[in-house]
């Protein structure tokens, strides 16, 4: 189904062409003065230069040409040459009736040529709990993935676990000091290794920071950890068995935490999965003449003539022959191309890694790891800060675990729900329903609070504001959906059947009704735009506008007491379309709505 803005542009363009002007001047846009009109076209301003006449002379001709067009209720030429447009309510109602026939799609077509897209997001480290710094990658990545799937693409999410390097050696060395009798440390052991891990997740989460602290103060311990890392990378059986245990225990816990965020991954691959591909990749870079030795390290030049700042070479191996993140990320691309042949790869990390990804992407293209036509995209996000403007911390100043943050917001939402219940004697929730509802609303508060900000910008994580039922918040959006559910339930309780998707939505009879209809008509454009720009904040902006329009319509319209049955059915059909679109959008953002609040 064509976007409404495109249909309007087609009519305006036709008028420009019929008056002898170039079609490029007929593009319509949303009005930047909604008090004057709904859409506008400024093409006459640009056309005036080419046709050497006053812009208002052109806009007057276009307005006259469109004056009897059934699409518009108002076409106005305004000096110095603007074209102001208002849609005919009948035409707008017809567009919405076409939208509601496509249940679940609402006029948003899937792409004609689906792509295979891999999204690299999450990026947790094994043996470490998720902390608030992991929130943005998970939440933004999940939404981008859902948007891509909704548009019809084959989208694969890969968590890309940090499970390689010195951290593994540190854990192995600390474990060896504590439990030297374990068979994993016996180089002569040739039997089967135990299937049960020799540690729990809580023990593992304590082992790593202890070992990390020791390595900074004890040179011998650090040396032993580096040796253990080397032996692991060379394939020592016992250490590889320990790595498997570390991964299994960590991944089980990570999955639980991500599930609480309503985030899931198609692939649970790690840096260790890329290691087998490194030797052949490095050899090919050397053979093809791309990699050379510089200050002992193996590098590939990635600078380009058009660079306005210096782009250093991409380091492939350190002087001691050890691999780096660059090496692992490039080798990861090797297996992704081999296994999935993607058309696009999207990476979500802190925006401070922009230069790093410029180097890696250029190296991947230059050395032929990925085809030239594969799109490599880095979404760099800003920092989540506390009210003091500094990175979010616990009250004690430490890094806050993500599950503790979610618990804190769950408790705040539960408190608010119980407070609200005091005024609802006949409709009180029991404890179980209240807790379940609090979790649903809390997740909306966290996710919407993050996603409503442009990804690249830092933002203040304000629990009081994010958990408010008023303003641009997740709970406000959910409140709007629950309000619609409540009206529909009351309508049914009076013996009425909910209208089917084919029920006619009538032309608007009030300004608030038309504003709601105009907001609904923007759905397909909002979703397409949000995915094309990998910008979930645009979905948030859209549903905030739609929720405001719905609530204004609700306050200005006697929906349940309307005496004209056709008009009332039209109102209900309008509410059902709004509910469907809001529920689709929040699913794309990664949360859901309760039945009541």
Question: What are the functions of these language-model segments?
Answer:
Residues 1-93, 104, 108-597:
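Non-catalytic interaction-recognition regions
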Residues 94-99:
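Short, charged, solvent-exposed linker or helix-capping segments at domain edges/interfaces
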